[in-house]
Amino acid sequence: MRDAVVEASGGFPVAGHCAIPKPFRQRRKFTPLASERGLPLLAAKARRYGLAALAINNCLHLAALWPEVEALTNQGLGALAMCPSNAYVAPAGGIRKLFGTNPLAFGWPTGDDCPYVFDFATSVIARGKIELYRLDNKPLPDGWGIDRDGQPSNDAAAVLDGGALLPFGGYKGSAIATMSELLAPLHGELIIAIDPTAFGAVDYESHSRALLDAIRDQGARLLSCSIRSARCASTGATCHASSPLAAA
């Protein structure tokens, strides 16, 4: 705010009158404030129509996406959130940065204290991790980035200074990053809320728990398990044994 990058004054005007989508015109404000104001309206619209979307345009300092999708799962709603950002990532097969790290988050209620939630960048690694490698003067693993000439590089400084990160999964990650740029333009965020019961999924909670338990029973690690478990432990909350996030 000191550098006038973020506008501190004014409210969060809502543009449009329909439930899908419902855009917030941010004017360079902090996104968490707008999402806090918009999530109750989004949840109400999703319960009424079965599906609703909140678009926050021209936003800054988004931070993590998981708190927003988790907040919706705590109300019995499924949620999908995405946002583009500044250009840091080259498209698969490309030679220069074009995409943001374009995180994608998803949440689904399971009927207990621990919903299924994930939040990850569509780059092979978060940009902040590259910064840590540079600070520690450590070489990057192969496949994380390219230099300003489009050549593979293990030098964190070369990747950050004129180079680019790479998308995860090659063309698949690149396609998801493209989707995010198309669905959530204007440097904004898109949050979609879903009422599972609106689509005939009356017993969706037990089905969800059974599916996630079947994954864990094979010894596979579910996304965000250890993080959720640590959060539950630190706050004294209980993560049920049937929860997909109860064990690391």
PLM region descriptions:
Residues 186-248:
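Catalytic-core signal marking the mid-to-C-terminal active-site face
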Residues 57, 80-83, 107-109, 118-121, ...:
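Short beta-strand segments
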Residues 1-43:
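Active-site cofactor/substrate anionic-group-binding motifs, chiefly glycine-
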Residues 17-20, 48-52, 74-78, 100-103, ...:
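Short coil/turn connectors at secondary-structure junctions
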Residues 36, 40, 44-82:
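A glycine-rich phosphate/pyrophosphate-binding beta-strand-loop-alpha-helix module
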Residues 135-187:
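Secondary-shell segments that build the walls of catalytic and ion/ligand-binding clefts
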